[in-house]
Amino acid sequence: MSNPTSTPRADGFRMPAEWEPHEQTWMVWPERPDNWRNGGKPAQAAFAAVAKAIARFEPVTVCASAGQYENARARLDDGNIRVVEISSDDAWVRDTGPTFVIDDKGDVRGVDWGFNAWGGFEGGLYFPWQRDDQVARKILEIERRARYRTDDFVLEGGSIHVDGEGTLITTEECLLNHNRNPHLSQAEIERTLRDYLAVESIIWLPNGLYNDETDGHVDNFCCYARPGEVLLAWTDDQDDPNYLRCQAALRVLEESRDAKGRKLVVHKMPIPGPLYATQEECDGVDIVEGSQPRDPSIRLAGSYVNFLIVNGGIIAPSFDDPKDAEARAILQRVFPEHEVVMVPGREILLGGGNIHCITQQQPAPRKA
């Protein structure tokens, strides 16, 4: 497997949109007891449900530790799900796995961003994180795909969305946070994104969702549905701390033009809840120095925008919330050619994310 010293853009590669054909989806099996309650068993059931939902549409590969391999293999009893042994620190493969890039000659490669657990020693969620920083490399080794490594640039896959036609959406709250790349200016960060993802236009939303532990990942707040159309988490409640965030994002989106010069169509997606963990749920998480404490008074950053587009399907979270039905209807309207599958997302949310955060699509090779 080669490790090019050039950049994807220089080699003719680009990050494809999520709706472009997939070869498979990657996941990592949860077990960390200081993040997942009750030894991770409820989360494992939730991850298994997500994996099986995706497997209806495309192959799934789940990475499990040596200690959990047999358990994961038994619970993922589906012929379209492969389980491989990979050690990791936690289960957020959107952020620790590779960002795959493709060219028009049938090749697929991967970008291995630096990872510091969403902030390193200035707000990061756990330490150590070196096994998570190795996940992308291990996946690319398994797939025998060339790897572009950015040793001096930290980025999580959940902090970006692309339309496949030259436009990227992100948030200032995350990418400009001093705990990611304090040595780089905004212009230098943009240059890196252009070099490694082959985008032309970058739309900067001010913030992500309120109380998002990742410092406002865009994949929990706003995502592309197709070129020129986005879904935006939304509330009309002026007392909701998300209200001003939604308004500010909408202003930016309405004033922006994408790389093709198009104005954006914005589909508003209701925010569930407000949702909170129960005391019992918090008590089920181990207390370990250096990890994120759980508090039932802190609002959870629940979002229906945190879904995954797969081959012919939309895998989206439900929360046993009155807005679940409305979210499903919006997704079905926005994606009329896809089957919308809602999977319970509360257990994943309790750990700090949702379906998009725990998945990473690998695009299928394609030739022009």
From Swiss-Prot:
One GO term (biological process): putrescine biosynthetic process from arginine
Similarity comment text for this entry: Belongs to the agmatine deiminase family.
Its annotated pathway reads: Amine and polyamine biosynthesis; putrescine biosynthesis via agmatine pathway; N-carbamoylputrescine from agmatine: step 1/1
Instruction: Give the matching InterPro entries.
Output: Agmatine_deiminase, Peptidyl-Arg-deiminase_porph
Cited PANTHER family: AGMATINE DEIMINASE-RELATED
Gene3D superfamilies documented for this protein: L-arginine/glycine Amidinotransferase, Chain A
- Species: Pseudomonas aeruginosa (strain ATCC 15692 / DSM 22644 / CIP 104116 / JCM 14847 / LMG 12228 / 1C / PRS 101 / PAO1)
Keyword list, A-Z: Hydrolase, Polyamine biosynthesis
In terms of domain of life, where is this protein from?
Answer: Bacteria
Sum up the protein's function in the record's words. Mediates the hydrolysis of agmatine into N-carbamoylputrescine in the arginine decarboxylase (ADC) pathway of putrescine biosynthesis, a basic polyamine.
On subunit structure and binding partners, the annotation says: Homodimer.
**So where's the catalytic machinery, residue-wise?**
C357
Catalytic reaction list? agmatine + H2O = N-carbamoylputrescine + NH4(+)
What is the name listed in the Swiss-Prot or TrEMBL entry for this protein? Answer: Agmatine deiminase
Q: Does the keyword Disulfide bond apply?
A: no
Induction is noted as:
By agmatine and N-carbamoylputrescine.
Q: Which NCBIfam families match?
A: agmatine_aguA, PRK13551.1
| EC number(s) per entry | 3.5.3.12
Q: Which GO terms describe its molecular function?
A: agmatine deiminase activity; protein-arginine deiminase activity
Q: Which gene encodes it?
A: aguA
